[in-house]
């Protein structure tokens, strides 16, 4: 059955036997959806529909308690544990909070407590719930929520998260302490990760929550370590008798922060319900501007003794409640599908939608990612679809609703020619991305390439914005990057909304950009798949534009961050006569590229020319500081121990790298001896 079919049944007129069967079927359906969402991270219904069905089941069981299903979603949290990780039983059950969906319901929760209370208020992070166990102040293991009773042991992955303390910041740690929190990926990191995934693996994550959950469930912790996950702590689970529990929830959060955990910047202590309403109003309006996704707000009774008095249900605490924001997923209709052309020629399908409000914004366009996604989701022109603002930023079509499909719905096909310049569209190596072959002859690519060229991390021409670039291209005043440096005052003031002062500011900004670093210039010229990090690596390796132009494939693939695909892109770039002409025009008009300064390494008998691995934490050095220090005296610092490793510098909590060094007979240097050697 579908959600709509459940809603369409007139359950209030069913006979008792039929009603019981309906309740059982609804409970089974929700259990299956919970499994798909919590365990497999592959939901097939919207959050809004799940919440409505859950409330329907609650209402039916409240009215007919004799029909309450055994072991249903009303009694437990999440789903079953995936195979592939060791399962561990939680020392204290990981419950979840009851939900409310309006201020009126939130007021009811407040009034039922029957005390004059303070509420600790915080955002409800949309990530992966985790429980981290500490023994005598040191990280022991980490477990996912799982089904609330037991979860997956993901210790090695969690330890890679930079803001997870491996040692509690206290001289008197409790014997045992279980800290709970949410692992998230912020919006900007999610977008960057998806760009990388699209380029290197031809797939993307649907949203930041799926990206965080998928990362933590990876078997290779080295891959996880490259993803900028963060932990936000929200409380504790099990604790030993020697733990001195604070008197309030707010003080507990401050204590966790003092231990080294990150807590939300948006926590607030409300002294009455009026302040609760103010907090709700503030966070509802600030939600879109937060760096991370939240799907609601959490309100907890602040007094710990009062929490104990109020108690728990089988599902979770009665002293806390989650207010869930209105659904960010709504239905709309696909009016048409158009194809946009990006900087590298990538053709992206965009759905033109019947305008609909999503998260306070009127959405009429949504990305369809690529033609493979359209086919996988079976999206057609004329379909009713679910629309979501992914990451609260980019509207996307989540899925079609084929049960409402019209007979004249049109299948979407990839065009054979560019919709802008009519050049041929190619699909290289059978990847999901199709590209226009027009290059600089395609106005869409030209415009996007020029926007990239002037961007902050490239040439940083800050007064030359995207809209002005579009105006200049449309007026045929610029076509190639060097044309920007030929613009004059009269040309700029002749454009719409360009007064004398604005025009002069643009010219000053252009002049200021004429001495870029080599790394900025490499990034600015827009070689496919070359990002900021790759540009730095190339600039530092070659030292000059001339050397970079003469780069050979065999040399390129030996450089950090440069694989075979990027190396091929670089070689192809310099084999294109138009690219060479564009770069030569820069030099002809007086662009002075600043080559990186070569740092001469000081000689050190112990470290120069040696391959070194750093492990553990140090009292007198930060890891980054120590790495830079070793490099400055000629050492090669690597991340893993092998037969080629000359020495391992070992701090506290060294772990497996120390063990491997000892097995291989690699020299181990402790911090106490390090200062003498340096």
UniProtKB/Swiss-Prot annotation:
Protein residues bound to NAD(+): 47-51, 96-97, 122, 145, 182, 300, 324
PANTHER family, A to Z: CHROMOSOME TRANSMISSION FIDELITY FACTOR 18 (PTHR23389), DNA LIGASE (PTHR23389:SF9)
Residues where Zn(2+) binds: 418, 421, 436, 442
Catalytic site: 124 (n6-amp-lysine intermediate)
GO biological process terms on file: DNA repair; DNA replication
Enzyme class, UniProt record, top EC level: ligase
A cellular component term, taken from the record's GO annotations: cytosol
Annotated disulfide bonds: none
Record's catalysed reaction(s): NAD(+) + (deoxyribonucleotide)n-3'-hydroxyl + 5'-phospho-(deoxyribonucleotide)m = (deoxyribonucleotide)n+m + AMP + beta-nicotinamide D-nucleotide
E.C. designation(s): 6.5.1.2
Necessary cofactors: Mg(2+); Mn(2+)
Protein name, UniProt field: DNA ligase
Residues of the BRCT domain: 602-678
InterPro entries: BRCT_dom, BRCT_dom_sf, DisA/LigA_HHH, DNA_ligase, DNA_ligase_CS, DNAligase_adenylation, DNAligase_N, Hlx-hairpin-Hlx_DNA-bd_motif
Keywords from the UniProt entry: DNA damage, DNA repair, DNA replication, Ligase, Magnesium, Manganese, Metal-binding, NAD, Zinc
Job of this protein: DNA ligase that catalyzes the formation of phosphodiester linkages between 5'-phosphoryl and 3'-hydroxyl groups in double-stranded DNA using NAD as a coenzyme and as the energy source for the reaction. It is essential for DNA replication and repair of damaged DNA.
Record family assignment: Belongs to the NAD-dependent DNA ligase family. LigA subfamily.
GO molecular-function terms, A-Z: DNA binding; DNA ligase (NAD+) activity; metal ion binding
């Amino acid at each position: 059955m579908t959600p709509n079919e459940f809603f369409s049944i007139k359950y209030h007129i069913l006979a008792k036997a039929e009603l019981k069967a309906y309740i059982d079927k609804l409970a089974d359906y929700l259990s299956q959806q919970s499994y798909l969402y919590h365990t497999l991270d592959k939901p097939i219904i919207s959050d809004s529909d799940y919440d409505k069905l859950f409330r329907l089941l609650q209402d039916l069981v409240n009215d007919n308690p004799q029909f309450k299903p055994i072991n249903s979603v009303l009694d437990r949290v999440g789903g079953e544990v995936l195979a592939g990780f060791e399962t561990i039983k939680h020392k204290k059950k990981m419950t979840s909070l009851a939900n409310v969906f309006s201020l009126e319901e939130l007021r009811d929760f407040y009034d039922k407590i029957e005390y004059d209370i303070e509420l600790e208020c915080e955002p409800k992070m949309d990530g992966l719930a985790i429980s981290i166990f500490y023994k005598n102040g040191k990280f022991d293991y980490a477990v996912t929520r799982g089904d609330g009773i037991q979860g997956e042991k993901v210790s090695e992955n969690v330890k890679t998260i930079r803001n997870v303390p491996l040692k509690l910041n206290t001289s008197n740690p409790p014997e045992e302490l279980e800290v709970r929190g949410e692992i998230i990926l912020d919006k900007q990191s999610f977008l960057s990760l998806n760009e990388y995934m699209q380029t290197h693996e031809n797939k993307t994550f649907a949203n930041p929550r799926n990206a965080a959950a998928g990362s933590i469930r990876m078997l290779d912790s080295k891959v996880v370590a490259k993803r900028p996950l963060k932990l936000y702590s929200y409380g504790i689970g099990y604790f030993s008798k020697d733990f001195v529990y604070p008197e309030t929830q707010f003080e507990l959060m401050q204590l966790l922060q003092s231990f080294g955990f990150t807590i939300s910047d948006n926590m607030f202590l409300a002294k009455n319900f009026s302040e609760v309403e103010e907090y709700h109003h503030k966070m509802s309006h600030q939600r879109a501007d937060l760096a991370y996704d939240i799907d609601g707000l959490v309100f907890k009774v602040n007094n710990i003794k009062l929490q104990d008095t109020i108690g728990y249900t089988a599902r979770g605490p009665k002293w806390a409640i989650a207010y869930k924001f209105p659904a960010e997923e709504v239905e709309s209709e696909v009016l048409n599908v158009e194809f946009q052309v990006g900087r590298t020629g990538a053709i992206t399908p965009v759905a033109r939608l019947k305008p609909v409000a999503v998260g306070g914004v009127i959405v009429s366009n949504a990305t369809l990612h690529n033609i493979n996604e359209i086919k996988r989701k079976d999206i057609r022109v004329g379909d009713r679809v679910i629309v979501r603002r992914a990451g609260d930023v980019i509207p996307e079509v989540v899925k079609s609703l084929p049960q409402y499909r019209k007979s004249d719905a049109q299948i979407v096909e990839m065009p054979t020619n560019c919709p802008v310049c009519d050049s041929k569209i190619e699909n290289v190596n059978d990847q999901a991305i199709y590209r226009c072959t027009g290059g600089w002859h395609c106005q869409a690519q030209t415009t996007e390439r020029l926007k990239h060229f002037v961007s902050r991390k490239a040439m940083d021409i800050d007064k030359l914005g995207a809209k002005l670039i579009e105006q200049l291209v449309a007026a045929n005043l610029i076509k190639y990057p060097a044309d920007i440096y030929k613009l004059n005052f009269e040309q700029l003031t002749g454009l719409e909304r360009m007064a004398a002062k604005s025009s002069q500011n643009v010219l000053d900004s252009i002049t200021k950009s004429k001495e870029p670093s080599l790394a900025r210039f490499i990034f600015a010229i827009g070689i496919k798949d070359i990002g900021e990090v790759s540009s730095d690596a190339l600039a530092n390796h070659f030292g000059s534009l001339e050397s970079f132009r003469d780069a050979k494939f065999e040399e390129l693939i030996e450089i950090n961050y440069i694989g075979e695909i990027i190396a091929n892109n670089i070689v192809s770039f310099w084999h294109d006569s138009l690219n060479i002409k564009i770069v030569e025009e820069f030099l002809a008009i007086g662009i002075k590229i600043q080559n990186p300064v070569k740092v001469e390494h000081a000689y050190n008998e112990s470290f120069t020319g040696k391959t070194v691995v750093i492990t553990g934490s140090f009292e007198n050095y930060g890891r980054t500081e120590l790495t830079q220090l070793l490099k400055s005296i000629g050492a090669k610092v690597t991340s893993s121990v092998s037969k080629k490793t000359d020495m391992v510098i070992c701090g506290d909590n060294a772990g497996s790298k120390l063990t491997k060094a000892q097995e291989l007979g690699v020299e181990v240097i402790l911090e106490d001896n390090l200062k003498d050697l340096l």
